[in-house]
């Protein structure tokens, strides 16, 4: 039965973007940053690398899942754009081929620009005899000992090649016959070698070096042909939770299995001419034409991360000017625990430092008045100071409970390591919940103050990861609100498995309630608008895929409610369609920092309801994850959030608006340039400088652009709260 609002059928596929194609469009917006004239050269190369890294995961998970559906004969269309799995795979191939070709065209342009700074990407045959001699020495010393040719014949079947591995196919004349072999390039050796001559530095890809000196591996035989190829495998395998006696052991089994999943993509150099060998390889990998990509340059451009890191020491002026996160405006120089007894404290990372959150746990671990610490961990850094503090707290006799989500994709191995280490230190470790991923960001510290127990709660939109907190925009609040403290205690009891679904005072928790609360809030906004004529909804998130909420937003738009959506990534809703979504606008901001915070605002006739959350409006977040949506009740913090969203909606440098056809366009620059991320960095720096000069919290007037302009005047005082 189709849902109808008014006379419009909102199930028509033309009102929706397909999830996978929308993600590819997001990844293209990442690639667009390599064209931005305001980005330094090395940062442009970084965006090309990010594009490739993103695409690897997309193929390992999303494409792999679609291919599995096709193999099982599943041909039911998805519920929004109504495309079957095979139709999606065909469309992905067309769109992604275009985007990848654009990526390599841009890569080759930027590599030519590098030559202006005496950095040249070359093949070994382009080097002088003296440099080839040096290269040969380096090859024999650092590369050759790591290589093992894998013969392919009756006694040597086709080898199990690792996921994302780079390999060289070799044909050898052994006199008796022409045989083949594969040389897998170890992932732990450098991807490129560098050679200096005068003022120039030459960069040579390791696969080109191995190919040039390939005879060292096949002494006595003639090498006839070689070509390089790369395999991507299915990493979207099933973790069997139901029958697992020990989830830790099951995860470790799963990690081994993932390395050799079925092949989902084969990448080849477009100059590869060995058609017969390529056909043989395709048959061995059991892939189809749709899975093959011919590339005009080195395979796997994620090597640019390492190249940029290598060159940034010499060419620092070709990177972003360093930014140091500043003291939080809500905290200033005050003690985090003392101040939180008086009022809620707001944090906006990475404009404001993540260090106070690290200190929040560190101080609790050291304080003899601390009774208990409870925390959820989804993704943490490899040398996490928070992990160290939790271990120290347990060793100091505190009651420490940590939920480590073992099923956090591509962080499983890291999380297994931390779970074992925390257990060894005496922490009570929860591995997660059956069939659910715990994606919530919450920490609870219980202290004895004046012979009474006081609970301090941190709630956030992003991970407790001190490394990504410098790159991802996220928000958090520390509060001693008694209702939220009680909710936090009940939440952790629920996670531990010793409680049925609690009744919460203020926290809203998925998989049970977040979707229902969103529906209720949208319905109330519709009623308020029909009565007062001022309905407005603003939402900021990473992705929007949940059809139930999209339909409700269509209904609100049809009722006249103004809806502004700031969605960095996937957006399955098409805005601006007359009679359906004409009152909805969608903007995506992709820039220096990765937009990661989730904010939900409902005007409610000037009695606004504002929430922060760990959850995007995706079906998986609504029904397959443990998420927290929490209210922002402090008026000054709420105003900061509203001002922040208005600022982002006014961004005419990094903002792209989606049209009714689902296409994204840069905002037309009809006013003074405004980059919301740069603006907030300037604001934070100014506050940090003022804080050094005075002990009282300053007013935090905005930094004026050198270009001035109306927007800078309008935004004066916007972020002073």
Swiss-Prot record:
Mg(2+) binds at residues 379, 409. One of its GO terms (biological process) is polyphosphate biosynthetic process. The active site is at 439 (phosphohistidine intermediate). One of its GO terms (cellular component) is polyphosphate kinase complex. Residues 692-721 are annotated as: Disordered. Keywords: ATP-binding, Kinase, Magnesium, Metal-binding, Nucleotide-binding, Phosphoprotein, Transferase. Residues 434-468 form the PLD phosphodiesterase domain. Pfam families: PP_kinase, PP_kinase_C, PP_kinase_C_1, PP_kinase_N. An intermediate of this reaction is the autophosphorylated ppk in which a phosphate is covalently linked to a histidine residue through a N-P bond. Belongs to the polyphosphate kinase 1 (PPK1) family. Catalyzes the reversible transfer of the terminal phosphate of ATP to form a long-chain polyphosphate (polyP). PANTHER family: POLYPHOSPHATE KINASE. This is Polyphosphate kinase. It comes from Staphylococcus epidermidis (strain ATCC 35984 / DSM 28319 / BCRC 17069 / CCUG 31568 / BM 3577 / RP62A).
């Amino acid at each position: 039965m189709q849902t109808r609002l008014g006379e419009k059928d909102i199930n028509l596929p033309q009102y929706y973007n397909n999830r996978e194609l929308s993600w590819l469009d997001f990844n293209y917006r990442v690639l667009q940053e390599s064209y931005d004239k305001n980005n330094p050269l090395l940062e442009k190369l970084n965006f090309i690398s990010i594009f490739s890294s993103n695409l690897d995961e997309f193929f390992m998970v999303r494409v792999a899942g679609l291919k599995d559906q096709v193999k099982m004969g599943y041909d039911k269309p998805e519920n929004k754009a109504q495309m079957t799995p095979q139709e999606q795979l065909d469309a992905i191939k067309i769109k992604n081929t275009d985007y990848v070709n654009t990526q390599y065209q841009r890569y080759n342009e930027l590599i030519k620009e590098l030559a202006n700074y005496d950095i040249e990407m070359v093949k070994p045959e382009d080097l002088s005899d003296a440099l080839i001699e040096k290269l040969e020495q380096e090859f024999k010393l650092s590369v050759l000992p790591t290589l093992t040719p894998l013969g392919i014949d009756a006694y040597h079947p086709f080898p199990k090649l690792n996921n994302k591995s780079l390999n060289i196919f070799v044909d050898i004349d052994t006199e008796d016959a022409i045989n083949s072999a594969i040389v897998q390039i170890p992932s732990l050796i450098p991807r490129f070698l560098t050679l200096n001559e005068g003022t120039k530095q030459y960069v040579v890809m390791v696969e080109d070096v191995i190919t040039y000196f390939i005879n060292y591996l096949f002494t006595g035989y003639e090498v006839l042909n070689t070509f390089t190829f790369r395999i991507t495998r299915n990493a979207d395998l099933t973790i069997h939770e139901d029958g697992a006696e020990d989830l830790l052991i099951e995860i470790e089994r799963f990690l081994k299995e993932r390395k050799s999943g079925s092949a989902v993509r084969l990448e080849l150099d477009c100059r590869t001419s060995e058609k017969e060998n390529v056909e043989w390889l395709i048959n061995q990998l059991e892939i189809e034409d749709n899975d093959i990509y011919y590339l005009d340059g080195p395979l796997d451009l994620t090597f640019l991360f390492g190249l940029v890191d290598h060159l940034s020491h010499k060419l620092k002026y070709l990177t972003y000017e360093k930014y140091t996160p500043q003291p939080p405006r809500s905290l200033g120089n005050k003690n985090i625990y003392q101040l939180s007894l008086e009022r809620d404290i707001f944090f906006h990372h990475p404009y404001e430092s993540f260090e106070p959150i690290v200190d929040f746990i560190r101080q609790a671990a050291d304080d003899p008045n601390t009774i208990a610490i409870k925390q959820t961990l989804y993704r943490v850094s490899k040398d996490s100071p928070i992990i160290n503090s939790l271990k120290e707290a347990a060793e100091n006799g505190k009651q420490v409970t940590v939920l480590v989500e073992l099923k956090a994709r591509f962080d499983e191995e890291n999380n297994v390591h931390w779970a074992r280490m925390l257990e060894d230190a005496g922490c009570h470790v929860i591995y997660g919940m059956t069939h659910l991923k715990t994606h919530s960001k919450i920490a609870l510290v219980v202290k004895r103050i004046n012979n009474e127990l006081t609970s301090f709660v941190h709630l956030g939109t992003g991970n407790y990861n001190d490394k990504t907190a410098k790159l991802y925009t996220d928000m958090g609040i520390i509060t001693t609100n008694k209702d939220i403290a009680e909710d936090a205690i009940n939440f952790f009891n629920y996670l531990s498995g010793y409680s049925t679904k609690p009744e919460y005072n203020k926290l809203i928790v998925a998989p049970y309630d977040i979707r229902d609360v969103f529906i209720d809030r949208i319905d109330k906004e519709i009623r308020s608008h029909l009565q007062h004529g001022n309905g407005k909804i603003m939402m900021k998130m990473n992705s929007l895929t949940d059809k139930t909420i999209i339909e409700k937003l269509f209904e609100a738009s049809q009722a006249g409610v103004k809806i502004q959506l700031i969605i960095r990534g996937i957006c399955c809703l098409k805005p601006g369609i007359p009679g359906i979504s004409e009152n909805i606008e969608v903007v995506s901001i992709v820039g220096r920092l990765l937009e990661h915070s989730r904010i939900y605002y409902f005007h409610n006739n000037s009695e606004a309801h504002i929430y922060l959350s760990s959850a995007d409006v995706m079906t998986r977040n609504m029904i397959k994850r443990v998420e927290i949506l929490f209210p922002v009740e402090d008026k000054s913090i709420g105003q900061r959030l509203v001002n922040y969203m208005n600022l982002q909606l006014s961004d005419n440098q990094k903002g792209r608006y989606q049209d009714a056809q689902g296409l994204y366009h840069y905002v037309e620059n009809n006013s003074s340039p405004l980059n919301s991320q740069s603006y907030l960095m300037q604001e934070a720096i100014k506050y940090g400088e003022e804080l050094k000069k005075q002990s009282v919290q300053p007013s935090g007037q905005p930094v004026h652009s050198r270009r001035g302009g109306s927007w800078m005047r309008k935004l004066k005082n916007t972020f002073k709260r």
